[in-house]
């Protein structure tokens, strides 16, 4: 029944709304009990670049887009908001904002996880004597106790993607935020917390375990905000929100927003949400998301593996007494790179890139190094093409870009195999770049694993909907969710990974040349 028609409120609430607030788009899907998409809406995220290396989002614009896509998707489904049983919200991680506790006024725009303003601070800390002392102390503690809780700080390094350093920057550079914090009047929130705060007109201030653990300020072993780290960085503990279950009744959206009070039944970080949407419920289940960034996640069950170079532990989700841990390896600028290649007219439509790459035997020695974080965690990595020749064509450039994605996938997968002591199952892929058959097949060849791609690659939206649906009773358990999964394509290894070794060795040399630019 179309939105707003008389009598539409009489229909039972049998639908769940899943919203994914990503780095490039805000998407909303309305799902029925069979997990079928009944209506959708999408808007482009408008990133701001006020200075070189800075990436921000206007909170009012993001709020307007968020509310807009929900209303549009429900209308597209021909439904009334009264028929929505639950709202689940998946959000990009580590993008944050601070605001005044009494007035609700932000002290600054959202600072994106892609923002590099803390690069100098990160480098200074990573080279500091204090951090070296911390490494020694916790290495000794781990040696004598065998407690893995001490392993993470023994190898602690800071990254520009983490919230911690950028939050420290805020209190050093925005006097209003610092003064409010000293008076216990400052609130910190990732995107989920801010949206919840706005939806409830300021009555609910909270986050969930998946979002909290992704900030780099939350201790996954103790499941609390890290007081030692906050003391080191002079960040007041009073700013942080309470942490709730991922699938949980967070309250209802104020009726002024959607016309009726819509139950908010899940908050979840986007990669953990995609993991849940892919039904990676068992230890050893592997999820590969290739969107704006690339993320490998392994379900490690109740085992929390400490950080290793290139990998870090996260809380996947908490539902009641169940806490599921993940190990993650990430790379940034996958989708961003492909969009850039389109903007400079290397191709017209992204769908043609796989065909372009296959039209030639190889990249003719051309290598592309995106400006993503490699194993050295170098924020000054230079994006570059290398090996260009007079015979180089657009096809060679496009193939080099796609190959770089597959090579980085191989690097991260090898680290996971080495460090995660759990037998790995079939890989499940999602995200926009998973629609590229060249990248998918090459990745399958390189890691020698079968990769499944679902019919709908918007797994973050589906995961948020699944979590909200469980909390509202629309679905009863995870076994029921598994039966709703639909696989569109399965990629199986077709070439021996050794055939790619010369090309990958050349690419790795190109990466080394681009470090510390």
Curated annotation (Swiss-Prot):
Record-linked Pfam families: FGGY_C (PF02782), FGGY_N (PF00370)
Subcellular location: Cytoplasm
Keywords: ATP-binding, Cytoplasm, Glycerol metabolism, Kinase, Nucleotide-binding, Transferase
Record: residues binding glycerol: 93, 270-271
GO biological process, one term: triglyceride metabolic process
One Gene Ontology cellular component annotation held by this UniProt entry: mitochondrion
Gene Ontology MF terms: ATP binding; glycerol kinase activity
Principal place of residence: cytoplasm
Family: Belongs to the FGGY kinase family.
This protein's name: Glycerol kinase 5
Species this protein is from: Gallus gallus (Chicken)
Gene this protein is translated from: GK5
């Amino acid at each position: 029944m179309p939105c707003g028609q008389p009598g539409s409120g009489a229909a039972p609430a049998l639908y769940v709304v899943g919203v994914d607030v990503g780095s490039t788009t805000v998407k909303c899907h309305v799902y029925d009990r069979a997990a079928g998409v009944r209506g959708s809406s999408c808007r482009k995220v408008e990133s701001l670049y006020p200075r070189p290396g800075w990436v921000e989002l206007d909170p009012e614009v993001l709020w307007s887009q968020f509310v807009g896509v929900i209303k549009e998707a429900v209308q597209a489904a021909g439904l009334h908001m009264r028929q929505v049983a639950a709202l689940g919200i998946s959000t990009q991680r580590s993008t944050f904002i601070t605001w005044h506790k009494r007035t609700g006024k932000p002290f600054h725009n959202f600072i994106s996880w892609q923002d590099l303003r803390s690069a100098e601070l990160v480098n200074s800390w990573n080279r500091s004597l204090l951090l070296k002392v911390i490494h020694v102390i916790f290495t000794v503690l781990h040696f004598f106790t065998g407690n893995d809780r001490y392993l993470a700080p023994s190898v602690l390094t800071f990254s520009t993607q983490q919230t911690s350093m950028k939050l420290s920057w805020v209190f050093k550079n925005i006097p209003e935020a610092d003064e409010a914090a000293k008076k216990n009047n400052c609130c910190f929130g990732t995107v989920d917390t801010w949206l919840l705060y706005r939806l409830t007109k300021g009555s609910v201030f909270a986050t969930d375990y998946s979002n909290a653990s992704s900030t780099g300020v939350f201790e996954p072993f103790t499941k609390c905000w890290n007081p030692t780290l906050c003391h080191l960085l002079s960040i007041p503990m009073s700013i942080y929100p309470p942490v709730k279950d991922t699938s949980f009744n967070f309250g209802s959206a104020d009726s002024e927003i959607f016309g009726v009070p819509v139950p908010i039944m899940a908050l979840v970080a986007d990669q953990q949400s995609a993991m849940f949407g892919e039904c990676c419920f068992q230890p050893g289940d592997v999820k590969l998301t290739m969107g704006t960034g690339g993320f490998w996640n392994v379900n490690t069950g109740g085992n929390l593996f400490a950080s290793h170079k290139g990998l870090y532990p996260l809380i996947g989700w908490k539902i009641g007494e169940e806490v599921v841990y993940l190990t993650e390896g990430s790379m940034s600028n996958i989708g961003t790179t492909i969009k850039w290649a389109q903007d400079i007219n290397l191709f017209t439509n992204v769908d043609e890139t796989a065909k372009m790459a296959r039209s030639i035997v190889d990249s003719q020695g051309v290598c592309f190094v995106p400006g993503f974080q490699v194993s050295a965690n170098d924020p000054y990595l230079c994006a570059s093409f290398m090996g260009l020749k007079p015979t180089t064509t657009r096809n060679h450039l496009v193939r080099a870009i796609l190959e770089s994605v597959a090579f980085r996938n191989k690097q991260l997968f090898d680290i996971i195999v080495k460090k995660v002591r759990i037998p790995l199952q079939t890989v499940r892929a999602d995200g926009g770049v998973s629609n590229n058959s060249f990248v998918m097949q090459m990745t399958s060849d390189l890691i020698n694993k079968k990769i499944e791609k679902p019919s709908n690659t918007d797994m973050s939206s589906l995961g948020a909907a699944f979590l909200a649906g469980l909390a509202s009773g629309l679905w009863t358990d995870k076994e029921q969710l598994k039966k709703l999964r639909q696989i569109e394509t399965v990629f199986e290894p077709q070439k021996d990974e050794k055939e790619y070794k010369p090309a990958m060795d050349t690419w790795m040399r190109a990466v080394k040349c681009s470090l510390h630019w």
